[in-house]
Curated annotation (Swiss-Prot):
Keywords: Cytoplasm, Isomerase, Manganese, Metal-binding, Rhamnose metabolism. Disulfide bonds: none annotated. Its cofactor is Mn(2+). Belongs to the rhamnose isomerase family. GO terms for molecular function: L-rhamnose isomerase activity; manganese ion binding. It comes from the Bacteria. The lineage of its organism: Bacteria, Pseudomonadati, Pseudomonadota, Gammaproteobacteria, Enterobacterales. Homotetramer. This is L-rhamnose isomerase. It is an enzyme of class 5 (isomerase). GO terms for cellular component: cytoplasm. The gene is rhaA. It comes from Escherichia coli O127:H6 (strain E2348/69 / EPEC).
Length: 419
């Protein structure tokens, strides 16, 4: 440890102690908050089922930065490289299209066997795994409908895919000793004016009930459902709207997924957390950065990321909120994208843990909004960076931008050879 780092750390401890914050306790709490990294940043949501197929479902990965992962071994190597540069506990979030098999596997026939390599890798790296059925980029989703499809045969295919995915998720939780959160998102919707908005939602309701009908151990598996405002090609009507899924999660007591990019640009999910927590047992967050639409830009340490973290910490939601990331930028180094976004999420959590929340609540209750605003703003100038650097030091990760040199070296030695 350098003398400069030690001095900054000691000063930070004193400064935060002056406002009633124990920085050691803050770091202990930060180690209680794993962030689930999304595998699909590493290959632009291509997966291994049909890597050359086109991405559908109203989502886009833009850019053509060289060196994307072409198979599971490369993707795991890239993830390991990124994770070495991110301090603290982490998980990995997988989609069903990241299965491994020597022969083609229909999505309604996936089994834990197709993901055993991921489980062994997770064990070796002390990671939890989360999961998602992949209801997109498939011939049977080509017309824009899956679980709400009017064709019974097609709808049943997607029901069976989601049921098979739940068993994979439960396998993850059983093997790794930590529950897998399995999130269901579907692209179902219509491009233009929709006459019958009710029937697809009735079909989706019944389909979801069938999907979750098999009772699984909650210590191994958690169901979550995710809404969206619109997607490309589904601008006018989305079957799985916010109202639909909030009602579903409330009535069925599943987890609700809030994605930062899945609402109107004037809405923020930080404001939705406390409301939803009154009705649903758990929340899954997809922290992202929408630029004018659900563009899934790399997460910044911006006001909304900070507000999301603050809501979790201020209301002590550590055991009820699962933090995941969801972005995919193919225009920059993909490992750097993981590192930047995940470190920013963890920085936001640390800053939230260093807030004198009890004092702020006292001022708010007393109606002293002047002091509340003053303290909130002065808090931003306290030396949280020194606490972050110590956290990185203790987890053997680079504290500052020197992590970028590690990425550049990996890019030169590994990524550049992929073509």
């Amino acid at each position: 440890m350098t003398t400069q780092l030690e001095q900054a750390w000691e000063l930070a401890k004193q400064r935060f102690a002056a406002v009633g914050i124990d920085v050691e306790e803050a770091l202990r709490q930060l180690d209680r908050l794993p962030v689930s990294m999304h595998c699909w940043q590493g290959d632009d949501v291509s997966g291994f089922e049909n890597p050359e197929g086109s991405l559908t479902g109203g989502i886009q990965a833009t850019g053509n930065y060289p060196g994307k992962a072409r198979n599971a071994s490369e993707l795991r190597a890239d993830l390991e490289q990124a994770m070495r540069l991110i301090p603290g506990p982490k998980r990995l979030n997988l989609h069903a299209i990241y299965l491994e098999s020597d022969t083609p596997v229909s999505r309604d026939q996936i089994t834990p066997e197709h993901f055993k390599n991921w489980v062994e890798w997770a064990k070796a790296n002390q990671l939890g795994l989360d999961f998602n059925p992949s209801c997109f980029s498939h011939p049977l989703s080509a017309d824009g409908f899956t679980l709400s499809h009017a064709d019974d045969r097609i709808r049943q295919f997607w029901i069976d895919h989601c049921k098979a995915s739940r068993r994979v998720s439960a396998y993850f939780g059983e093997q790794l000793g930590t529950p897998s959160v399995m999130n269901i998102w579907i692209p179902d919707g219509m491009k233009d004016i929709t006459v019958d908005r009710l029937a697809p939602r009735q079909r989706l309701l019944a389909a979801l009930d069938e999907v979750i009908s098999e009772k699984l151990n909650p210590a191994h598996h958690i169901d979550a459902v995710e809404s969206k405002l619109f997607g490309i090609g589904a601008e006018s009507y989305t079957v799985g709207s916010n109202e639909f899924y909030l009602g579903y999660a409330t009535s069925r007591q599943t987890a609700l997924c809030l994605d930062a990019g899945h609402f109107h640009p004037t809405e923020v999910i930080s404001d939705k957390i406390s409301a939803a927590m009154l009705y649903v047992p758990q929340l899954l967050l997809h922290v992202s950065r929408p630029v004018r639409w659900d563009s899934d830009h790399v997460v910044l340490l911006d006001d909304e990321t900070q507000a999301i973290a603050s809501e979790i910490v201020r209301h002590d939601l550590f055991d009820r909120v699962h933090i995941g990331l969801d972005f995919f930028d193919a225009s920059i180094n993909r490992i750097a994208a993981w590192v930047i976004g995940t470190r920013n999420m963890k920085k936001a959590l640390l800053r939230a843990l260093l807030e004198p929340t009890a004092e702020l609540r006292k001022l708010e209750s007393a109606g002293d909004y002047t002091a509340r605003l003053a303290l909130l703003e002065e808090q931003k100038s306290l030396p949280w960076q020194a606490v972050w650097e110590m956290y990185c030091q203790r987890h053997d990760t680079p504290a500052g931008s020197e992590w970028l040199e590690n990425v550049r070296t990996y890019e030169k030695e590994i990524l550049s050879r992929r073509g």
